[in-house]
Amino acid sequence: MTVATAYKRHSIRGVRLRGSIHFRGSGKKCITQLFGEQMMVANATGCSSIYGGSAFVHRFAIESSTGAFFSPYCRNYRSGRGPAWANSLFEDNAEFGLGMATATRQMRESLKRKAEELVNVTAFDWMCEATQKWLDTFDDTLANRKATDEFVAALEKAILPIDGAIEFWQGKGKEAYGAEVAAQKLQEAKEAKAAGSPICPCHGCELESYLLANKEHLAKRSQWIFGGDGWGYDIGFGGLDHVLASGEDVNVVVVDTEVYSNTGRQSSKATPAGAVAKFATSGKKIRKKDLGMIAKSHGYVYVAQVAMGASQAQYFNVIKEAEAYHGPSLIICYAPCINHGIKIGMGRTQNEEKLAVECGYWHLWHFNPAEEDAGKNGFHLDSKEPDWSKFRDFIMGEVRYNSLMKTFPQEAEELFVATERNAKLRYEGYKKLSEM
């Protein structure tokens, strides 16, 4: 037993002790530590793809036992498995990820029908047991990985070579099934060998051979769609809403920097009132769009708003709940950005997230439809009552706000009051939902 295996793999301590199969210092690292060996990622063009895996450096390098990393995404050196990552165009990433999920689901459902048929025809109890275990964990990402490995091992063991089939029907098969049946099966085996078949021609072996030939599609995939607020709130919003409305089992992460970061600091619908950005040099006049509440209105979408620096435990639990939920999920992550002009420096972004939540600028919450279906209140406000006295100090600690005071001081004061009022209205709305 090693230190890493002393704790449950998917506990907070267990994850911290495991090697990552993604670059370090990111919320995505935590996701890869939990589900990396089964992850498929559709990544929108933007900051999330630039620092998340540029095409010309992306390669399946092996993670070394010493923790050395050679590319943003790597394979686990023990299992040889790792995330499958692809970068789409900016505007169609949600649909791109949906296509991945749909294709995977249809392939697995086809294999599921074959496995259900195999349960009824296999002559081996251990084959039946392994097949049934795979079927029972079909929709469980974590449990199905182990069940798949056992299923594949059983398939490899169960397939009878053609010479073995001939030998069986000449001897033990005759005793077990009778001379008449054995003679018929022996003739079929000889004909199959003459035709060049390497395996027993029985229906069970045919099913096992087909399943084994498609073994890479057996395990439950963890489908993720990554993008920024320019994609999720603006240009790709129509596609994102379509994907959420599809009911497909996908997980969407929106990295919310509240501005078009990669394209040059332009204002987006995620930009709050009072913030200075291109196309809003005198401060944005209208409030930030509440993407989370829009997604929640579907009623069957798991939605969460997180800030890892404010609560690692909430972020960790949200990631696990989102993956476990059988349906679409949306996780909106507050992400301090160089375009914010943070006075304390980009080396302290985790602390900036903590301050944002403490003062009420950002709120932590999650909505789980599964709890609502069970007759409970599925909405949970995860952050404490904000200290509103810190709100003005927080925004003045960022150049995107304090620069407005220098250029348009009168308008700045009015907009800053509106910014705080909007934050309070959001909080009161979330609080009411959590108390229902």
Predicted stretch roles:
Residues 23-27, 34-37, 43, 103, ...:
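General structural feature for long, well-ordered alpha-helical segments within catalytic domains
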Residues 13-18, 80-128, 133-140, 144, ...:
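Conserved thiamine diphosphate
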Residues 32-39, 55, 108-111, 115, ...:
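Structural signal for hydrophobic packing residues in well-ordered secondary-structure cores
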Residues 192-212, 217-225, 234-251, 255-385:
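Glycine-rich ThDP/TPP pyrophosphate-binding loop and its adjacent helix/strand module
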Residues 18-19, 228-233:
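Short, glycine-rich nucleotide/cofactor-binding loops
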Residues 1-185, 198-205:
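Iron-sulfur-cluster electron-transfer modules
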Residues 1, 31, 63-132, 136, ...:
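Flexible, low-complexity linker and terminal segments
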